UniProtKB/Swiss-Prot annotation:
Protein name as it appears in the record: UDP-N-acetylmuramate--L-alanine ligase
Binding residue positions for ATP: G126, A127, H128, G129, K130, T131, T132
Similarity comment: family membership: Belongs to the MurCDEF family.
Gene name of this polypeptide: murC
GO cellular component terms attached to this protein's record: cytoplasm
Species name: Psychrobacter sp. (strain PRwf-1)
Name of the top EC class for this enzyme: ligase
Listed PANTHER family: UDP-N-ACETYLMURAMATE--L-ALANINE LIGASE, UDP-N-ACETYLMURAMATE--L-ALANINE LIGASE-RELATED
């Protein structure tokens, strides 16, 4: 039987024994809400809690999921199992109540692994590009009629959601390396987009331990599984012999199994040609900009082709791809004096990701001045990538810096926003402006000019400012 015929089989997923009701602590998080939605659609009773109301919690409530705002031991009264995100402290009253009641308390990745247990799981890992790659692969397989279940770390703009329960044997999901929880997954196939020095505290500040974790992740596949890795990434390429599983590589270099050539940017679209062994060249148009997104698309194309997705479905998926929330997302053009300001919001929070955003913005809108409002994410990342941040942020025309979004970390001396601004100023390419979020309006009014593009950049709450701008020109 061909692979393309396999997904036509509808599957029956065994129920989790004795588990009827699931409670998610931190249900509004990007990684948690999708699993909660899928479990609800599978017929389980689902509840959740979060510290504040958000569009995500409101949407979950509209699906019939009971969401409590605030954490309280009473919230788990009807639960048979409690799922927690890595951001939740062990002293949380709901966790303590669950332990006292002898309920299982499991990590998000454990529940994702349970979803994957009886399915043909495809996991997407890597330092950068996971969400976009997962989304593109989901679109390709959906266009081909595979009807996969998917759990993505960002909202698919086309569907307005980041998870869906399909009827086929396929499950496509992001695999999170930040807390090493991706090691709990046992997929049938996996993509690694790249490897970089991020979340190093998890790995004892050892790059060798980080690389070993990726190898273990890929070795969690069965011996007949497939590893799709970026052959342009030297660290990944050097690891191939240690994987011990079938491997296909993708990239821009000719040694790869799947290669992109003739890459051209045309506004917000990217055109390129895909070369694959024993196939005719495939001319494609990707409906988002950036060479980094060509690599993301190649990763998805490589996996989709191996799974039996036809070229027409790949073409349609790339041409209609509307992007992912907070990934170079164009919010609006807002009026400014006798012109406008283009608002772009991006989640990237690592120097490599910020550099990719800047490159894509320059290529797409070369006539616009690039103003970036950057919010550093975590003191540890600012410390570990300090010199790279200084170099990358110096490439913009106007730089506004918000305080570090701590994500629960204690401040680190020399890794704060003022130190970062001082080093950028000494480099001499751009004059950074440190600004308090509550005093942003007058600074924006003074700095922004007609014809600018303003990029709100970071993984914290900076994206909310872009939404406010798009809604009512708050700072213009």
């Amino acid at each position: 039987m061909s692979k393309s015929a396999l997904p036509k089989r509808l599957i029956e997923i065994p129920e989790m024994r004795r588990i009827k009701s699931i409670h998610f602590i931190g249900v509004g998080g990007a990684g948690m809400c999708g699993i909660a939605e899928v479990m609800k659609n599978q017929g389980y009773g689902v509840s959740g809690s979060d510290i504040k109301e958000s569009p995500v919690t409101k949407r979950l409530q509209s699906l019939g999921i009971e969401v409590f705002i605030g954490h309280d031991s009473k919230n788990i009264a009807n639960a048979d199992v409690v799922v927690v995100s890595s951001a939740i402290d062990r002293e949380n009253p709901e966790i303590q109540a669950a332990l006292k009641a002898q309920l299982p308390v499991v990590r998000r990745a454990d529940m994702l692994g349970e979803l994957m247990r009886y399915r043909h799981g495809i996991a997407v890992a890597g330092a950068h590009g996971k969400t976009t790659t997962t989304s593109l692969l989901t679109m390709m397989m959906t266009e081909a009629g595979f009807d996969p279940t998917y759990v993505i770390g960002g909202k698919l703009n086309a569907s307005g959601k980041n998870a869906s329960l399909g009827e086929s044997r396929y499950l496509i999901a992001e695999a999170d390396e930040s807390d090493a929880s991706f090691l709990t997954l046992h997929p049938m196939a996996a993509i690694v987009t790249n490897i970089d020095q991020d979340h190093m505290d998890t790995y004892g500040n050892s790059f060798d331990k980080l690389k070993a974790a990726y190898i273990q992740f890929l070795q969690n596949m069965p011996f007949y599984g497939l590893a799709v890795v970026c052959g342009d990434d030297k660290e990944l390429f050097d690891m191939i012999d240690d994987i011990g599983r079938p491997v296909l590589t993708f990239g821009l270099e000719p040694h790869n199994n799947v290669q992109a050539t003739n890459v051209r940017v045309d506004g917000t679209k990217t055109h390129f040609t895909v070369l694959r062994k024993d196939r005719e060249p495939l001319e494609l148009t990707l409906n988002i900009p950036g060479q980094h997104n060509v690599l993301n698309a190649l990763a998805a194309i490589t996996m989709a082709t191996d799974e039996g997705v036809n070229d027409d479905a790949i073409k349609r998926a790339l041409a209609k791809f509307a992007g992912v929330g907070r990934r170079f997302e164009q919010q609006a053009c807002v009026a400014k004096d006798d012109g406008d300001v283009l608002l772009i919001d991006d989640y990237g929070h690592h120097p490599v990701e910020v550099a990719a955003t800047i490159k894509a913005a320059r290529a797409s809108y070369p006539e616009r001045r690039l103003v970036m409002l950057f919010q550093p994410h975590r003191y540890s990342r600012t410390r570990d990538c300090y010199d790279d941040f200084v170099a990358v942020l110096s490439q913009v025309d106007v730089l506004l810096l918000l305080d570090v979004y701590s994500a629960g970390e204690a401040p680190i001396v020399g890794a704060d926003t003022k130190s970062l601004a001082r080093s950028i100023r000494l480099r001499g390419e751009v004059e950074p402006v440190v600004v308090d979020k509550d005093e942003l309006a007058p600074v924006m009014q003074r700095v922004l000019q007609a014809g600018d593009m303003l990029i709100t950049q970071g993984a914290g709450n900076v994206g909310q400012l872009s939404q406010q701008l798009a809604a009512n020109n708050l700072y213009l």
